[in-house]
Amino acid sequence: MYAIRNGLIALLLSLPLTGLADTDCETGFFALQQALKRAGIHDAQAKTLPGYPHLGVNRWLAFLQQQAVTVPQQQQWIRLATAKAWRDQTLLALRLPEDNATFTPQAAHSLLKACLPVLAARTDFSTLPQAQIPDSYATWLRVAGLYPLTAWLATGSINDYHQEMTARFREPAPQPRQQFAPPVGASAPVAPNAVARNPLHIPLPDNQQLQALMQHYAPVLAVADTQAWNLPGRVELDDAHAPVINTAEPVTYTWQSWTHFRGQHLLQLNYQFWFSQRPKNGWLDSYAGTLDGLIWRVTLKPDGQVLFYDSIHPCGCYHKIYPVDPTLTLAQIKGDKPVLYSERVADARDQRLALLLEPNTHYLVRVTRVDDGLPTSPYSLADADTLRALPLPDGSVGSLFNAGGLVPISKRGERFFLWPMGVPSAGAMRQPGEHAVAFKGRRHFDEPTLAETLFE
């Protein structure tokens, strides 16, 4: 069987691009998916439209699919979905063993390069099913946990949490001892509206433009304690495939996203810092555990001014918002609300911001001007997708995340009393796209209309 399959794939990959038939590519794609499945290679971000493995989808693309009403818009949607499939499938293929009986990583890459354009060209948008992205909540947990009752009982604790986090913004902040700064951009960033001249009016910077944007708006990270677990670092995998944080190489992991607000598609810049642990504050600390982090997101208006910032930890916890635009008013939100920063924050288009973290908890307690007098170390920017294909000491490739989008080693004790709220393994670190940000109600960090939910 393997010999027949390998012969078919070898024949397929030997054909020139113009000679590939639809059925050849469909057969090759099916064989690749089966090879990945047999190898136990999965990725929660690599979702595809059912029946169309060459079309990658996420919450944003599912939203855009409904917005694509003209032929040019529909054609652009297919291109975007195909580009996502290329990204996802090539990352999955990197994790195939070199001695795989069906596909090597190189063979899989060649198949994708040859066949994705063929399959995209023959896709009829009108026949596609609407993309449905499952939410990150487990309904059965809420049913088993008598959610209506437990959500009501949790109201007091949620209110206490809001008061505690708001108080941290007002109380005297710890004095920073060291800060980590991004590289200075070599070129001025492009305004999002200059790269949104396409049928769907989405800001789509090219790689060089995106890098300039990421560098320009990147924050300085200030820490008040320099013990190892309070220092950001590069994520690496050890011999046991367990993640370790290399603090000798400070890094922020970046990705772009989009939100829809007031009739426009807005560009968002995401920055993720990783720490080795949240240490215990006493033996009953249910929030402590291996790995911790911070995600800082910058939402840009079409002219490049900042509309607002928001932040979470990689568990999806501690959602906080930091308005910049004076016209923003917090909406009446159902369920538990994000914590609102009590002061207006400066626009990172005009000045670099510093994020001051509380020691050990890594709570963000201040957003301030940069202190030029502090000892400063540089950090580098890395594509967050590299976390989905990390090199291992034995030469193979693995992922930080499991098939469900979680980092299992980061599980927290809080999962034992928060499970009735429907968030699987509450407190564990999660992959982008899996960040549930509310215990009461259902809300996700990557919802396409989250800005419209947050603000009037």
Which sequence ranges carry the predicted segments?
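Positively charged n-region of N-terminal signal peptides that target proteins for export
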Residues: M1-N6
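Domain-length functional cores that host ligand/cofactor binding and catalytic or interaction surfaces
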Residues: T23-A188, T290-D292, D303-E456
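Charged, compositionally biased non-catalytic regions
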Residues: R177-N246
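Short N-terminal edge-element motif at the start of the domain
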Residues: A228-Y309
